[in-house]
Amino acid sequence: MHGNTQSTASGVKTRRFDDILSEVTQAFEIHARCGSILGGVHLELTGEDVTECTGGARNLADEDLQRAYKTTVDPRLNYEQALELAMKIAAINNS
């Protein structure tokens, strides 16, 4: 997640859910081609209902970030985005 932080037009630091999912999916594909196993994924997340990363099931947009942007360092997935990503990782891993 560390390599995909972006800034919005108004300068708010964020991450895009689809970019994170793409990064994880690519990692699984690369490991599969190499015959190795991806042993873990590092995610920055919180159990709180923050709006720091865009996308996900609620389709948060840049305009939504100000509603509950609480981080003082890096944007985190909120609890819904984290669960959604975990379910997608499980589906990839079981395919």
Task: Give the positions of each predicted feature.
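Expand to "…catalyze enediolate/carbanion chemistry for C-C bond making/breaking, isomerization
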Residues: 1-95
